């Protein structure tokens, strides 16, 4: 880890004043500073005070499934961001089509992928897809959804 020599008190103050932390009770920040993570490598992260943590959350639930500091991935992403960072899913893109083709080889019996920006969006889209299938094949009579109670499905109202 690179030791941070900069004074991060301004960052901590800005965080405390302006950031709503996901899945957190903010009362605690009245008497203590929020933890500010400044660096990651592999499955480890370091906070502003230099304390090391094993990140057991981001890869399992959020977006860091391959760990931090993966230079080859960062370079590929940077190259694509310069070329074209995003275009609406209502149109095709070169990386989207090529990745879908590759992904389908790992999903026997399926022929299409749907890209979404989050797990919440994916869950809500699959609900709409299932409703459409039910309407087409069962006259709309099948309308129950199975889910695991008290499990994480996303942060939107629908999920």
Question: Which ranges hold each PLM region?
Answer:
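Glycine-rich loop-to-alpha-helix module at the N-terminal edge of alpha/beta enzyme cores
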Residues: 5-8, 52-139
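Fold-independent oxyanion-binding glycine-rich loops
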Residues: 48, 118, 148-150
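Conserved beta-strand and immediately adjacent loop positions that scaffold enzyme active sites
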Residues: 42-44, 112, 144
């Amino acid at each position: 880890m690179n030791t941070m020599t900069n004074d991060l008190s301004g960052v901590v103050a800005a965080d405390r004043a302006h950031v709503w932390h996901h899945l957190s009770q903010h009362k605690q920040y009245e008497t203590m500073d929020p933890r500010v993570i400044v660096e990651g490598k592999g499955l480890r992260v370091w906070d502003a005070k230099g304390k090391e943590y094993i990140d057991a959350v981001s890869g399992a639930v959020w977006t860091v499934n391959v760990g931090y500091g993966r230079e080859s991935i960062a370079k590929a992403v940077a190259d694509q961001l310069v070329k074209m960072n995003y275009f609406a899913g209502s149109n095709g893109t070169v990386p989207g089509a090529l990745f879908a083709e590759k992904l389908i080889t790992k999903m026997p019996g399926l022929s299409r992928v749907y890209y979404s920006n989050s797990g919440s969006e994916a869950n809500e889209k699959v609900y709409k897809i299932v409703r459409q299938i039910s309407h087409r094949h069962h006259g709309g009579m099948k309308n129950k959804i199975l889910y695991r109670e008290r499990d994480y499905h996303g942060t939107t109202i629908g999920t």
